[in-house]
Amino acid sequence: MRLSDYFPESSISVIHSAKDWQEAIDFSMVSLLDKNYISENYIQAIKDSTINNGPYYILAPGVAMPHARPECGALKTGMSLTLLEQGVYFPGNDEPIKLLIGLSAADADSHIGAIQALSELLCEEEILEQLLTASSEKQLADIISRG
């Protein structure tokens, strides 16, 4: 599967800002909820885990991959991509997060290919910068389609 295959239709968005990290998580997961990739419990599990464990899902400066355990309400494996034009601070993190990659992993294995492809993409500084400075959903989708 290509990386872009993990992103359901309408799962890539550019949003001006979020009032706080909880709203940023809501924005990043709503398309997966609407497409029945996750239950509402899954979103709450991410928030609860963030409060209890900190934002363990920050991947790189400005980039987070909010997710919870499969049994918390992941129904299908998929991803979303949300760019916040104005970054938001997560608890205990000094740098604002602008790019949220919502992850729903229905089991322990089905998302591994997507994570590998995404890691390769994010390791390239130029591509990461393009993601963080994109101005449209189409730009983001074009970048993801390279993975």
Swiss-Prot record:
Residue numbers of Phosphohistidine PTMs: H67
CDD domains, per the entry: PTS_IIA_fru
Gene Ontology process terms (BP): phosphoenolpyruvate-dependent sugar phosphotransferase system
Keyword terms, alphabetized: Cytoplasm, Kinase, Phosphoprotein, Phosphotransferase system, Sugar transport, Transferase, Transport
Sequence ranges assigned to domain PTS EIIA type-2 in this UniProt record: 5-147
Molecular function as annotated in GO: kinase activity; protein-phosphocysteine-L-ascorbate-phosphotransferase system transporter activity
InterPro entries in the record: Ascorbate-PTS_EIIA_comp (IPR051351), PTrfase/Anion_transptr (IPR016152), PTS_EIIA_type-2_dom (IPR002178)
Keyword field contains Amino-acid biosynthesis: no
Keyword Phosphoprotein: yes
Active site positions: H67
Pfam families tied to this protein: PTS_EIIA_2 (PF00359)
Primary localization: cytoplasm
Location in the cell: Cytoplasm
GO cellular component: cytoplasm
PROSITE patterns tied to this protein: PTS_EIIA_TYPE_2 (PS51094), PTS_EIIA_TYPE_2_HIS (PS00372)
Domain of life: Bacteria
UniProt comment concerning the protein's domains: The PTS EIIA type-2 domain is phosphorylated by phospho-HPr on a histidyl residue. Then, it transfers the phosphoryl group to the PTS EIIB type-2 domain.
Primary role: The phosphoenolpyruvate-dependent sugar phosphotransferase system (sugar PTS), a major carbohydrate active transport system, catalyzes the phosphorylation of incoming sugar substrates concomitantly with their translocation across the cell membrane. The enzyme II CmtAB PTS system is involved in D-mannitol transport.
Entry protein name: Mannitol-specific cryptic phosphotransferase enzyme IIA component
Organism of provenance: Escherichia coli (strain K12)
Gene name of this polypeptide: cmtB
